[in-house]
Amino acid sequence: MFIPNDRPSVLQLPKHEKDSTAADIKSIVANRDRRLIAVATNDAIYIWLANPQLLLCSVGVIDANFKETRGELKEIYWKPDSTSIAVTTNQCKILIYNLDLRDDEQCYNFTDSADPYFQRNSPELFIKGSRPTAHLHPTIIINLADIPTCCVPSRDEFLVCLQNGFTHHVTWTGEIIASLSFRASSIPFSVDQLQSKSENITSKSTYIFDAVYAPLLGGFAIVLSDGQGALLTSNDPNFAPNAILGVWAPNMKDATCCDVNHKFLLILFGCKNGDVCAYNIDELNGSLVQSFRVAPKVTNGPDLTNRLGPVHRITALANGYGFGAIWSPLSGAHALPRLVAVFTSFGAQSFCNLEGVVEEDQNDRYTAIEWGPEGFQLWLGTENELMMQPFVRSASCSSPAMEHCDRAVLMSDSQVLISAARDREAEACAPHSVWDHITVTHEYLSSNWPLRYASTDRNYKHLVVAGDQGMAYCSLSNRRWKIFGNETQEKNLLVTGGVFIWNDDVIGVVGVAADTDKSHLSFYPISQRLDSRYASVVDLEHKSVMSVLRDDVCAVFDISAQITLYKLTAHLETGRDAFTKVSTEIVTVIRINEIVPHPTCIVSLQMTQLNLDVRGKLSPAFYSSIDTVLVNISGRLITLSVNEDGKLHQPMVIASYVEKMWHDRCQVSQSTQSQNQDLPWKNHRRNGSNVSIQSVSTSTTSEPSSPMNQSCSSHLSNALWIACGAKGIKVWMPLVPGKRNLATQEMTFIAKRIMLPFELDIYPIVISAKDCLAMGVESQLQHVARASRNQGQMESITMYGLHRNSEVFVHHLLRQLLKRNLGVFALELAGACRSLPHFTHALELLLHGVLEEEATSSEPIPDPLLPRCVAFIHEFPEFLKTVAHCARKTELALWRTLFDVTGSPNALFEECLQLKQLENAASFVIVLQNLETTEVSMDQAARLVKEALEEKKWTIAKEMVRFARSIGSEDIDAFFRTPPPSAKTSLSRRPTVSSPSADSSTEFVINRFQAGAAGGRLNKVRHSQSTEQKDAPRKDSIGGSSKDKMALSWGLSGELSPQLATNRLAAKMTSILEDHAWHLLNNYWLLDLGFFWSELQFDLLGLLETRRKQISLSPKTTNENCFLIEDFALALTRLHAQFSWPYPLIGSQFVHQIEKKLGNIRVSQSTASLNGLLNDSLDNIKKPKARKLERTVVDLNGARSRIRETDIEASEEDVEIQEAVLERVRGSAVELAPVIDRSPSTSSSMNHHAPLAPPSPSSCDSRSLAGDCYQNTDFLVGEKSSRGNLQSSHQLELLLSLFSQTATIDWIFLFCLLSRDERKLRQEINVSMVRRAGEKSFARVRFACSELSRWAVEKCCGYVALLQAFDAHLAVVAEQAGCADLKFSPDNENRKASQKTSADDPKRGRRRADSGSSKLNNSFSNPKLNGMNGGRRERSRSADRAHKSVKRYDDVVCAEDALEKANEEGCSIM
């Protein structure tokens, strides 16, 4: 795989005449080793050095008479030894130039200045590579009878084709060999080389337009002037005219150019319609068989391909791993931008320059193309300029062992790029673009450019690279490079078969010694410097061209078509410099010369284990766990295995058109893998449809886990993955259904494999079988703006960046198995993949692909796959989610087909409601709106909204309301909305993209939590969830996540306007929302009301205004009409629970005030803890005896219960008596300094188990709702009383501002009391507020203050002093408003009835009351009780179902009486 990287280099061509026009590049050709690049324009020849890009020499045609007589230059050709070049013209001439290269003389030499400041000190500034001087000398001009069309150079002569139909053999000295000349019309052509009858071309004017020498195919690939393609073969090595036979390329009538891929034995033809067609030779009859036919694809601009003209030129890589092509624009159409594309060997497109291009007015086009050394450079010529684009390729092209890496490893001419580890990709903001760039040290690269081999160890600790000579390796942890210290040793080592790292501490090199020309296998220890003294050298019989490593076995393939397997053994060399020595032992020698046409045709070589155990008996193997050798010969994947007699089985071709292959057993054996990793399949056990595979290792095995929990099934771990270019991906999967013999308890396997083809949108370079992911790399065009050199203007430059992409393929495998009626294996495979995060998305892709293909088919399908696919998905709990998502992303015309198989959408909707899958139910509502009647869809939508509101799925409710309001009244009344699909419906394929998983049920993204405009933008509903993510249980106010509470603290200003109902469904939704808002307000769920207000953009201001008017008109009506606060104590306790707001502690000064009033009293340990005085010591108090006491506990919903416990004897340090004077705070007359306490606040018995008590707002690091006003109440409630955090304070502040706008005075009073904010109380409750709210409402607040005072005495004395201060302010306001004499007398019967309704109505608050009570019960109960009965937790009670032993605060007359009564009973002050 070759893709561009970085930006291209534009090279300037010097002009030989002042008045000459811009260079019109006609041809670019590289010499044999591709170090020299020859460029021909219409009037000049240039010789460039490939690296660095230096112009060595140039020759220009200046004489006008010469141009007229000889013509303009056209094509240029190299002599194989690079000593001469031949140039054709358009005037029947061929010019031959001699090239004089002098390696002993270097050009472009730099001379350092005498000034030391201008001298080169860095080694990168010195060019060590060869820069020979070059001189072109014209020697021969060959006159021809007609214009030459093409030439084919060889060592002693070159073939010249003319437009008159003749073809001549011309020597490099200018002589024409007349005896070997022939005419195209005299050549017999046939469709094969054996049986068919040959015929000559009838037209005398037909000539050879283009020709390429194909020695491994036995002749020349040609293109005739009439567009036909053929292969010229001959049994005569000199190609005598009488021995030539032409073989037609079938169905090739519009060829324009051709080239040959020697490694894969392919003939490439460019066509007039823009396609590239490839042919290979059939070994049976010698005919040409079409391998593939491809055309460039532009994902983001398919209209550009409509202007595609003929292929102008095509060129294959020298190593055969790809080819590039350029196109001409279509005549008569709009100008096509410059187009160049690169494909893999079998036609998979890896790069097209039109992806992401900004189309501009470009009049020029690419006129020439040529590859540089090793394919790392692509030279392109246009009508105006010459450019060179750098490329990178996969490291596995030259190192087969790198095919099985779990990371993407790419290499350029001077760098190695390694992708980040999968487990570390989450740390990067753009992990797909992060690469580890390892630049090879300049000391090695300057004389050995370019890189040819690169390899890493399995743990990516070391990297070894090799260029022309020697090698170098790097420690990836510290980026330190090591090269040969002796330069002679480096130059003596010529790497021919690759490099590898064995055992993480030894580097293996397969090469040739330059001085002796003998091949050897050398090992160098990493612990020592690179030196021949420490090398372990093994002589090889023949020159080796490829090597591969697996475990402790190294396989070497040499030019005699022999594979030798060496067993490697390491031992420590003793001595002062101890280092690792490696000894080898030949295990197996495999000769395959009969099936290998040439050593160049070997693409890759792998050792693996394919055969599975049969009844516990190991299959025959070459060595240990190596029973199969895989050889890719020109794209044919052949298996070599041994029989029980030690002889080779007949070689078997398992796949054709193979470019790459992956197999988990190729890099490491299963036994080694089981030792390194804790794999769950060491034994085989059949359990239902779940299968695991037994390891070959004989180590001790343990009971395996279910394959449902395995990360990779045995099918995938033993599968062979094959990339076939344009033909897609194939997987050779074993089918291993295990059966347990109850009598013998032996394992039996059905040793069968099946080839499953499928296609991917990317070209994979890494296949991760355990994750079912294919990783690819693409080069994306990026436009960068920079300042221009001319007048400071901005200009745009383009460059390419490498980006990794991944694709899921498990749905392709499931589909192929279901298609072949292998549902049992599909269930096994899916069961093993259920833990994958993209499994649900894979099921969706499976259903969507089958549905779209079968529903849009114009022909009836005899055996439809959709019913089988639906039945398969129904086996998994993700069935409803899969169907819902598939329906949402599919055209409406296909819904009928889908739900005819899956069942009625109404039934699926009901099932979603039962399973609380509200996200999926929302998708089915949209389906119902299009398929069912109006009444059905309206009823179901209303049910869903109600359920979503109860479950606090705010986003679902919001989207359903938005959906209802978006429907026009004329649409909702229409009965038929979606016609049934036609059988001939033609629909475009829409990609299904998995939306990110998110639990948005309580995601309180505040965009409108304050009086905000209702016309704000609404977020999309995202339904996708990960496989592990189950439907979250309903969360109450105190069970909500911190994310919900933090979001509640956001807000923005504006006026909230109600949405206008435009249809019946929208009106019904509005009614539901109003009912739910009343429900939340009546049950005192203010936090949920805030979320409800924010997410659904509800007109809460209008609702509260309605409430205010009803209360002002008739404040004594029932709670069902005006929603009064009937139980202020219950409302206060629920506010504490919802906002995680701690209860106030009694102040020490307040204790002294009571102490003075009541005399010496005994304070229990709980009271001392309540006051934060547990660590103070007193000497004047006697130790009280242990005694029984009753302590009252308040739960979440205000329920009271008395718990008996034995109070431990308090020590003298448990109590403290202080004196203080209780003064009324008027305004800010009393200013107290803030108390900074960084120690954790002392908890009372009520909040001992409060989870994560927030820090005190009095801390200098905290910020509170009331600001400095907390300082005025600290002496009342205790300096160490903790308050809510900043987040809760903001939430309270937003709600308080809302209630202030609507004069909701009762809730204003409770919020000020909760936040202990007397200053806020004075700001909010004043004379103007009383007039707005009404005197009767204000009288009710004063009554509530007295009621809460009675409750505080019994339940929480920390509120007693605070309520006294609040009551004093209310009295002042009443006096100023002239309503001091107005009293509020509640209707006892109505109040008791409402209390009973609140407790007994299961629809109005039981769920919310019970949902969070257990959590707060832990916070308010005695810690000793939590450990009773073996950790059994007592079930909390609702406030309205209080225990009968609890005394209601209605019986309490006043605070003084309560204190006296408590003293008589021996109770402590709470």
UniProtKB/Swiss-Prot annotation:
<feature type="region of interest" description="Disordered">
    <location>
        <begin position="673"/>
        <end position="710"/>
    </location>
</feature>
<comment type="function">
    <text>Probable component of a guanine nucleotide exchange factor (GEF) that may be required for efficient fusion of endosome-derived vesicles with the Golgi.</text>
</comment>
<feature type="compositionally biased region" description="Polar residues">
    <location>
        <begin position="1411"/>
        <end position="1424"/>
    </location>
</feature>
<keyword id="KW-1133">Transmembrane helix</keyword>
<feature type="compositionally biased region" description="Low complexity">
    <location>
        <begin position="689"/>
        <end position="707"/>
    </location>
</feature>
<feature type="region of interest" description="Disordered">
    <location>
        <begin position="1238"/>
        <end position="1259"/>
    </location>
</feature>
<dbReference type="GO" id="GO:0031267">
    <property type="term" value="F:small GTPase binding"/>
</dbReference>
<dbReference type="InterPro" id="IPR036322">
    <property type="entry name" value="WD40_repeat_dom_sf"/>
</dbReference>
<dbReference type="GO" id="GO:0043547">
    <property type="term" value="P:positive regulation of GTPase activity"/>
</dbReference>
<keyword id="KW-0853">WD repeat</keyword>
<feature type="compositionally biased region" description="Basic and acidic residues">
    <location>
        <begin position="1385"/>
        <end position="1403"/>
    </location>
</feature>
<dbReference type="GO" id="GO:0016020">
    <property type="term" value="C:membrane"/>
</dbReference>
<dbReference type="GO" id="GO:0042147">
    <property type="term" value="P:retrograde transport, endosome to Golgi"/>
</dbReference>
<keyword id="KW-0812">Transmembrane</keyword>
<dbReference type="Pfam" id="PF25440">
    <property type="entry name" value="Beta-prop_RIC1_2nd"/>
</dbReference>
<feature type="region of interest" description="Disordered">
    <location>
        <begin position="1017"/>
        <end position="1045"/>
    </location>
</feature>
<dbReference type="GO" id="GO:0032991">
    <property type="term" value="C:protein-containing complex"/>
</dbReference>
<feature type="compositionally biased region" description="Polar residues">
    <location>
        <begin position="983"/>
        <end position="1001"/>
    </location>
</feature>
<feature type="compositionally biased region" description="Basic and acidic residues">
    <location>
        <begin position="1028"/>
        <end position="1045"/>
    </location>
</feature>
<dbReference type="GO" id="GO:0005829">
    <property type="term" value="C:cytosol"/>
</dbReference>
<feature type="region of interest" description="Disordered">
    <location>
        <begin position="975"/>
        <end position="1001"/>
    </location>
</feature>
<feature type="transmembrane region" description="Helical">
    <location>
        <begin position="1294"/>
        <end position="1314"/>
    </location>
</feature>
<dbReference type="GO" id="GO:0000139">
    <property type="term" value="C:Golgi membrane"/>
</dbReference>
<feature type="repeat" description="WD 2">
    <location>
        <begin position="68"/>
        <end position="107"/>
    </location>
</feature>
<dbReference type="InterPro" id="IPR040096">
    <property type="entry name" value="Ric1"/>
</dbReference>
<dbReference type="GO" id="GO:0006886">
    <property type="term" value="P:intracellular protein transport"/>
</dbReference>
<comment type="subunit">
    <text>Component of a guanine nucleotide exchange factor (GEF) complex.</text>
</comment>
<feature type="repeat" description="WD 3">
    <location>
        <begin position="472"/>
        <end position="512"/>
    </location>
</feature>
<feature type="repeat" description="WD 1">
    <location>
        <begin position="20"/>
        <end position="58"/>
    </location>
</feature>
<protein>
    <recommendedName>
        <fullName>Guanine nucleotide exchange factor subunit R06F6.8</fullName>
    </recommendedName>
</protein>
<keyword id="KW-0677">Repeat</keyword>
<dbReference type="GO" id="GO:0005085">
    <property type="term" value="F:guanyl-nucleotide exchange factor activity"/>
</dbReference>
<dbReference type="GO" id="GO:0042177">
    <property type="term" value="P:negative regulation of protein catabolic process"/>
</dbReference>
<dbReference type="InterPro" id="IPR009771">
    <property type="entry name" value="RIC1_C"/>
</dbReference>
<feature type="region of interest" description="Disordered">
    <location>
        <begin position="1385"/>
        <end position="1447"/>
    </location>
</feature>
<comment type="similarity">
    <text>Belongs to the RIC1 family.</text>
</comment>
<keyword id="KW-0472">Membrane</keyword>
<feature type="compositionally biased region" description="Basic and acidic residues">
    <location>
        <begin position="1431"/>
        <end position="1447"/>
    </location>
</feature>
<dbReference type="Pfam" id="PF07064">
    <property type="entry name" value="RIC1"/>
</dbReference>
<dbReference type="GO" id="GO:0034066">
    <property type="term" value="C:Ric1-Rgp1 guanyl-nucleotide exchange factor complex"/>
</dbReference>
